[in-house]
């Protein structure tokens, strides 16, 4: 069933936006949401400073933490630092799809762990995928949904913590 959910995610991403062009909007996504993480990454390559304070190339120079909204230390974007040969726009397409698919699959497994049947868990995860913000925001305003896999892991971790199965499983909550 998880493989089927990934296929549905791929199909619906293609159906709703991929067949009309790129999995990413031509407004905010290409002008802001791929540009700022690429700037953060380039600044890291240029300075080697993981915690810079000043961004000289943005707005005449500003405190870089003014742009934390664009995912300055997001785990999703930090992985791109390891891939200097990949264009940020291509990376964001892959990362957005991966976040969406993993959130759907993690929700499915969390529901099964909570005692729901496979059918109910599958249909709920499919409805979650088809909810208005998930696919739309994945290719328009990625920062509104790229936290969803971490939220699903946090739900799983809180359940384990409350059942005292594993005290260390609460750590995804802090991301």
Residue ranges of model-derived segments:
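Membrane-water interface at transmembrane helix exits
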Residues: 17, 80, 108-112, 159, ...
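Alpha-helical transmembrane segments
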Residues: 1-14, 125, 171-174
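Transmembrane-helix signature of polytopic, membrane-embedded enzymes
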Residues: 107-130
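Hydrophobic alpha-helical membrane segments of integral membrane proteins
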Residues: 119-124, 142-147, 169-173
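Membrane-interface coil-to-helix junctions
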Residues: 9-104, 126-149
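Membrane-interface transmembrane helices that cradle and orient dolichyl/undecaprenyl
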Residues: 154-170
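Central hydrophobic cores of alpha-helical transmembrane segments in multi-pass inner-membrane proteins
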Residues: 101-109, 151-156
């Amino acid at each position: 069933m998880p493989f089927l959910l990934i296929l549905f995610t791929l199909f619906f991403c293609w159906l709703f936006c991929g067949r009309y062009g790129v999995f990413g909007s031509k407004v905010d996504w290409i002008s802001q949401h791929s540009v700022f993480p690429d700037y953060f990454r380039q600044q890291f390559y240029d300075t080697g400073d993981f915690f810079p304070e000043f961004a000289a190339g943005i707005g005449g120079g500003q405190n870089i933490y003014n742009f934390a909204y664009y995912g300055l230390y997001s785990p999703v974007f930090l992985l791109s630092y390891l891939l200097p040969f990949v264009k940020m726009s291509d990376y964001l397409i892959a990362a957005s799809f991966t976040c969406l698919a993993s959130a759907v699959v993690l929700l499915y497994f969390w529901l099964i762990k909570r005692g729901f049947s496979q059918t109910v868990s599958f249909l709920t995860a499919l409805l979650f995928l088809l909810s208005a913000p998930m696919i739309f925001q994945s290719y328009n305003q990625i920062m509104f949904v790229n936290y969803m896999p971490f939220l699903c892991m946090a739900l799983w971790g809180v359940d384990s913590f409350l059942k005292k199965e594993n005290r260390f499983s609460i750590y995804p909550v802090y991301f």
